[in-house]
Amino acid sequence: MRERGGDWKMEQLRGRIISRGKGEGEALTTTQPISFYGGVDPNTGIVIEKGHQLQGISVKGKILVFPQGKGSTVGSYTLYRMKKNGVAPAGMINRECETVVAVGAIISEIPCVDKVDISKIKSGDRVKIENGTVTLL
């Protein structure tokens, strides 16, 4: 919940649906693009890209908030493998989703939304994604 004029209210952000579904969890945010192929360990869900803001942190069960993906198209299948291994994020929110993340979210059935002002979401926030709506709880 966010404090607005002395009251606590839920804030809702509307975005574009990339992958339908519902996900809820703690936000894990970065201002850097993410490469799932080679940047995230598909067996543990830990970001392994050297120098990345999230290096050493697990995305498992988190609402992963990042500007966009980057890297190889194999990243889509890395997301799928993460889902099968039980270490995928509970949902993803992008400023601008690109093909690799979109395909990975869809085939893995991970809720994903883009066209959202991701600067409003901070690591540790409780977040719910339901289709095109992002709710900060």
Region spans (language model):
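Feature captures the catalytic cores and cofactor-binding loops of soluble hydro-lyases/lyases
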Residues: E11-G23, L28-T135
